[in-house]
């Protein structure tokens, strides 16, 4: 009986379980106060972290920028204002803010209109132009899978993000064998072109997919949906969110009685010789501490990748993906985290080439536990059985509400890294990374939950 209990209450439970025994694993559990190793299995081995990767990005952003940092978005103009007429163009200069228009909240545009009118502008002889030059033109991370491009969870990342870089495509299902009809997009995207091959069939699930590339007006709709379903929505990415923002601002100005001579446009190529502009107004995002909650609690890829790309601009302009990769690697190495074998392709964990060890995550989490920004850090992590992506983990068990951690999920993979508040007052720091397991992620989570519950009983 004691032998069986020991197997259940150690990492041997994971290595001997039929679901996880042959998986690619890296595990480390330590006492945060004493540094004692509670359990360990190949903790130096790098494996795909999935969304646990967001800990590297959000931790670096919090430490470098501070919890009170706010993304600025500038309204600027060229030319002069004469007798209420702007003889030039109005620019919206982005700096990677992921919050603009998120969840359809566009009331900030009314404040922008007020600021423009307060500057004495009654008519614009030029256009509203989206300035997306802070980043290079590589909006889609090359490490992401081709089949992810165009999906809502893998949107392009721009210096001007808007509406969560996501649109809802409303389709209408018909008789079996027919093609579902595209009704509209929310928000409306005037020049988008759908190549629609979504078939209606005698199925019970929604199997429609969206694909396409940043800046391209074409979006491919494929797959199948239940027949005679009525209208339903399929989420995809916005091809050019900055341009959509410029169009929406143009419409608000015109709706308010202001004449704007030309249609909205955008610039994406950085030019260090760009003539200076006159600053008219600066819009600030909510504080970084709030942005991190959306990033980690809801595992928002747009938010994480925007932070990742913004950090890269600290090296040079325009910001590049390579700069962002180097910054994360360099920053955590300077902080004493073992990243020499880490592979960092993106900031959100969507790239399958990402590879991080359990040891790296535990070192990072240990550093953050004593940071001056600890409160903001802990508030950004979902809580077991209660919030976000941890809502189903250890619910209605003795560990409900005691785990603050980030999860990561892809096919055959379930990862967790964070903190456990023990009943005796101790805090454990842990990383459990299980990849290539022959089963569904929810079943892998059940095994991990059994392991964690057994581990605390042993200790």
Description of each model-found segment:
Residues 1-7:
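Sec-dependent signal peptide recognition
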Residues 9, 13, 188-200, 397-404:
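Short Pro/Gly-enriched beta-strand edge/turn motifs at strand-loop
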Residues 38-40, 298, 305-459:
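Small-residue-rich helix-loop
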Residues 64-339, 457-458:
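Conserved serine DD-peptidase/penicillin-binding transpeptidase domain
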